[in-house]
């Protein structure tokens, strides 16, 4: 039975559970158990603190884990990323009072407050900077106002919290993060584990694409195929209407409206976009 770690709370947990549910796995239910056995699919899920998941996976106690890249890096556990999940996106950055001119070189000898001390220490070491790293478990943004730190290093999603405290980020992102599936470093993905990953990829693909159906005059096929090439080419079927064909093709979701505009200009009719539930390529 495959053992998989899932975040036990927060936005990462909610999104991970949703994607696993769509992939056909048993949910956690309302009892908030620390583990759930899905006998039908041969998987046992363990609900752990996101910060601890990489440690369990690196020790070989669990086969796979879903957590944030930044959290996994801060644990300094030995792991490999096997799949990016396209949710939980953020950047990890330095920030200082707005209006002050800062760059990474000016961190020499300064106090840096953060909830990710190892990520910060590794970044400072890579840049040859000696600074004091102050670990805080939360509310990092207020530390400068209270005189605890000169700058902070924190997760930035929208930047709203920083602005509310009169702070602004500086320098390039230390880490660009998102939710990822991880495995112990040096271990290959097994056939059973690959089934899990394939199911998840199928959900991610479905979220990324829509199915487009439309009718068009056969003589215009070269023009519309240039707009909708699909992954390996469109599916084309003859219609009862002489000289016309039906076309079915997948297009990236974010481009669907622009593509439909172009098709309409080219004379296509009955243009329909449909959501996909699962899509394996």
Swiss-Prot record:
Cofactors demanded by this protein: Mg(2+)
Disulfide bonds: none
Any single GO BP term: L-histidine biosynthetic process
Predominant place of localization: cytoplasm
Assigned GO CC terms: cytoplasm
Keywords: Amino-acid biosynthesis, ATP-binding, Cytoplasm, Glycosyltransferase, Histidine biosynthesis, Magnesium, Metal-binding, Nucleotide-binding, Transferase
Keyword Disulfide bond found: no
Stated family: Belongs to the ATP phosphoribosyltransferase family. Long subfamily.
Name of the featured protein: ATP phosphoribosyltransferase
Gene name of the record: hisG
